[in-house]
Amino acid sequence: MPIKIDKKLPAVEILSSENIFVMDDDRADHQDIRPLNILVLNLMPQKMVTETQILRHLANTPLQLTIDFLYMSSHQSKTTRAEHMETFYKTFDEVKNRYFDGLIITGAPVEHLPFEAVDYWEEFQQVIEWSKTHVFSTLHICWGAQAGLYARYGVDKHQMTRKLSGVYSQSADSNNLLFRGFDDEFYAPHSRHTEVLKEDIVNLTNLEILSYGEDTGLSVLASRDLREVYSFGHMEYDRDTLSKEYFRDLKAGKNPHIPENYFKNDDVHETPALCWSSAAALFFNNWINYAVYQETPFDWENPENDASYFAYL
């Protein structure tokens, strides 16, 4: 099924060329079903790249979705034109009185900062608090996962001895609906300087550890009801994303390590193998289906009329 987005969004042309079905308001309004409303808090610097990556996976689900993008008004993007943000993004003030079936919080390149030093931290905390009563399920990605854990539970991140960069094998708890249809292990890209410790999750939260890797440590956590999902990897990444990050850091004189298990024979001039797209598609599909669609209240405009709303509060 399609995703419903602004037909002028740059990602539309890319997705259409990949035979991914997108529709505009006119066509969607003639379908007599309620689409799921998904909000994406895009904290990544290359907004349009991340938009396309996220939308590619959301469009793979068998349900109609209406997508809105959110940005932090307390932060000014230095890499995306203001016109793009004003046209395709909403501020928190514009959405705070609405209800959403799902929220995706992306990563952000601010790991080197304490959470409180991030210029939009106060606004981020407001979004997390608001999501507890206005969003049915939230999927946090990479820094977004670390920040969500800190905001909700006080679980802090820890500096790693070297950047974790590459494609790694992780376990999958196939007994959990998020990993239904997965093999015992799957591959996913990781790109981060910090980590969350297993003992902190065990001691400070009631979250379940659903995926763990020898190299990655914690990979995916979730609450028992799947209203909170935390993924420390980047399953949404394109084939060449880690490559672009590597050459960017190399050009900046950071002397980066070659991403592990990525380039054939560690030859940076080889085209990287893509070995995670099927797992990524299944993960996003499972999140939409099992964490959102099958549980979310039907009448978000008047949630007091839906008994399931009171069941999860």
From Swiss-Prot:
Residues that bind substrate: 163, 191, 248
Task: Answer yes or no on keyword Transferase.
Answer: yes
Q: Which GO terms describe its cellular component?
A: cytoplasm
Record-annotated site: Important for acyl-CoA specificity: 111
The pathway is: Amino-acid biosynthesis; L-methionine biosynthesis via de novo pathway; O-acetyl-L-homoserine from L-homoserine: step 1/1
Q: Which InterPro entries match?
A: Class_I_gatase-like (IPR029062), HST_MetA (IPR005697), MetA_family (IPR033752)
Q: Which UniProt keywords apply?
A: Acyltransferase, Amino-acid biosynthesis, Cytoplasm, Methionine biosynthesis, Transferase
EC number, UniProt record? 2.3.1.31
Role noted for this protein? Transfers an acetyl group from acetyl-CoA to L-homoserine, forming acetyl-L-homoserine.
Can you tell me which family this protein belongs to?
Answer: Belongs to the MetA family.
Listed PANTHER family: HOMOSERINE O-SUCCINYLTRANSFERASE
Q: What's the protein here called?
A: Homoserine O-acetyltransferase
